A protein has these predicted regions:
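A structural boundary/capping signal
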Residues: 1-290
């Protein structure tokens, strides 16, 4: 479990997140994912949540002999996580943002695939299993490597998925992307382990979509602040944050972000409309929808 990097005054919520994701590789994914909830729950003790997860892993680890095979550890983990602890997908309220907050998933035992996968992979890691998240189109999955071969699990319901089932799930995506027929992309390319930054981005994109759909501009801005820090090379995050600043009546901040986007993407398809919006903001005119 990571210890706090802040020996003196505590950081701001956003500063804490920025420090966690500053490293190019190997940042503390679980800790960063937990602290996302501090936008709604600023008093959340991230270290206490990490300790709770460690406690769950320790209980299962104590039941297993030191020489337990990888297959036995996997079977024990699946029963413990999905049956005994009762973790499952939140089928009744899938789009509740609480499903993206790991401390709430721990409390309710309900979540979405990506948060369930984060918890499962952490427990697997503490059992000595190699488990990674997979950004499968439309549904986050878990991939484990065993001496007997590779296992793919749907964290929403705990089912192991066969190659045929995975191919079937890919069918609609391949059709939409024009990847069927002679140009079909091998299944294995869709089952590559997702880097930590991509996993965290996918979690934040879920929250971004929820807030945008609800036109909840303050919450949307909070998520976008994190995305700009997490994906500093992605100019579209600046553009989107700029538009949210405009919705919140903050023209100076909106103009800064839109200017930065247009500087990096002068030939983007939306550049002409955004230049008009930027001119309005700089004149002090009322913002209008694009």
């Amino acid at each position: 479990m990571a210890t706090s990097p802040w020996p003196l005054a505590p950081p701001t919520v956003l500063g804490y997140f920025a420090a966690l994701v500053a490293e190019d590789e190997g940042f503390a994914l679980l800790e960063a994912a937990i602290c996302v909830a501090q936008d709604d729950h600023p008093e959340l003790d991230v270290q206490a949540v990490l300790a709770e997860i460690d406690g769950l892993a320790a209980k299962l680890k104590a039941r297993l002999p030191a020489d337990a095979s990888a297959l036995r550890r996997l079977q024990s983990l699946n029963h413990y996580f999905f049956v005994e602890l009762g973790f499952a997908g939140n089928v009744n309220n899938y789009y509740d943002r609480g499903n993206s907050y790991l401390h709430q998933v721990l409390a309710t035992r309900r979540g979405i695939p990506i948060t369930l996968a984060l918890l499962y992979c952490e427990l697997a890691s503490q059992l000595g299993l190699t488990a990674r998240g997979v950004s499968f189109p439309g549904h986050f999955l878990i991939k484990l490597r065993l001496p007997q071969g590779e296992v793919v699990i749907d964290p929403f319901n705990g089912r192991s998925l066969s190659r045929e089932e995975l191919d079937e799930r890919l069918g609609p995506y391949r059709a939409r992307q024009g990847l069927a027929g002679d140009f079909e992309v091998p299944l294995g390319l869709f089952l590559q382990a997702a880097p930590a930054r991509d996993v965290l981005a996918r979690l934040l994109f879920n929250l971004k979509e929820i807030a945008h759909t609800a036109e909840d501009w303050p919450r949307l801005l909070a998520v976008q602040q994190r995305l700009v820090l997490l994906l500093p090379q992605d100019a579209e995050q600046l553009r989107d944050r700029g538009l949210t600043w405009a919705e919140l009546g903050r023209p100076a901040e909106a103009a800064d972000d839109l200017s930065a986007y247009l500087l990096s993407r002068p030939d983007a398809a939306d550049a002409p409309a955004l230049r008009e919006r930027l001119a309005e903001l700089q004149r002090g005119g009322a913002p209008r929808p694009l």
